[in-house]
Amino acid sequence: MTAIKLDGNLYRDEIFADLAQRVAALKEKGIVPGLATVLVGDDPASHSYVKMKHRDCEQIGVNSIRRDLPADISQEELFAVIDELNADDSCTGYIVQLPLPKHLDENAVLERIDPAKDADGLHPVNLGKLVLNEPAPLPCTPNGSISLLRRFGIELNGAKVVVIGRGVTVGRPIGLMLTRRSENSTVTLCHTGTKDLAAETRAADVIVAAAGQPHMLTADMVKPGAAVLDVGVSRKDGKLLGDVHPDVWEVAGAVSPNPGGVGPLTRAFLVHNVVERAEKLAGL
């Protein structure tokens, strides 16, 4: 058995087509959504990610604003840039590209962002609203992951879902999102303290691998026919690798490739959050 490919590029193109129409409708009302990025330092991976985000904006018709800053910027200088974007009406939403240099306090930086302009959905206020099931920008990778499963008809209602990884960007929020009434899944959150990870994953209908450990999920850990999302990214010998071993494709019913699975949807839902806020401000 060879798994169905959960093609994130295909679904991203569908989302972009919809967003482009929505942006065109906003422009007819004189409103141009704007996405800003704040990039500190010269990390090649971060520069690549930011470049792709601005290319996405160009494709959809969203105005893009860049703030590329030196690696030795002080906390107060970075706060000043964030305060500027908070006050800039042309900036509908923005992100601070992580990771930041070690001398900067990431949590303090994220807390400085206006929660309404938090395009990543990772501000403490917005994560708190997720816990309370109140409307707020949703974290992009979990939102993209769940939407990808829905796009390809993977049943979530009543499904046993195992999430591997407890990070704030994926593991913790996706568990909250999957247990909403709209998804109604039963979620087990696994991590480095889990005693028998394989026993947990073999019982799962859906596995979300977000540990950042190359090829850690192997075929013998997967129930035949299960759906597997490969979310984790790591580098080995200069090569980008996901968490899912290639042999999983011979056992699982559906697998998201990495790259080309959840990654494109993370970017798509980043722009989605910006367009959605622009529509809200326009009263649409």
Swiss-Prot record:
Keyword Disulfide bond in annotation: no
Keyword terms of this UniProt record: Amino-acid biosynthesis, Histidine biosynthesis, Hydrolase, Methionine biosynthesis, Multifunctional enzyme, NADP, One-carbon metabolism, Oxidoreductase, Purine biosynthesis
Pathways involved: One-carbon metabolism; tetrahydrofolate interconversion
Disulfide bonds: none
Any one GO molecular function term: methenyltetrahydrofolate cyclohydrolase activity
EC number: 1.5.1.5, 3.5.4.9
Biological process, per Gene Ontology: L-histidine biosynthetic process; methionine biosynthetic process; purine nucleotide biosynthetic process; tetrahydrofolate interconversion
Binding-site residues, NADP(+): G165, R166, G167, T192, V233
InterPro entries membership: Aminoacid_DH-like_N_sf, NAD(P)-bd_dom_sf, THF_DH/CycHdrlase, THF_DH/CycHdrlase_cat_dom, THF_DH/CycHdrlase_NAD-bd_dom
Catalytic activity, reaction form: (6R)-5,10-methylene-5,6,7,8-tetrahydrofolate + NADP(+) = (6R)-5,10-methenyltetrahydrofolate + NADPH; (6R)-5,10-methenyltetrahydrofolate + H2O = (6R)-10-formyltetrahydrofolate + H(+)
GO cellular component: cytosol
Protein role: Catalyzes the oxidation of 5,10-methylenetetrahydrofolate to 5,10-methenyltetrahydrofolate and then the hydrolysis of 5,10-methenyltetrahydrofolate to 10-formyltetrahydrofolate.
PANTHER family: C-1-TETRAHYDROFOLATE SYNTHASE, CYTOPLASMIC, C-1-TETRAHYDROFOLATE SYNTHASE, CYTOPLASMIC-RELATED
Subunit record text: Homodimer.
Family designation: Belongs to the tetrahydrofolate dehydrogenase/cyclohydrolase family.
Name of the protein described by the UniProt record: Bifunctional protein FolD
Native source species: Corynebacterium efficiens (strain DSM 44549 / YS-314 / AJ 12310 / JCM 11189 / NBRC 100395)
Record gene name: folD
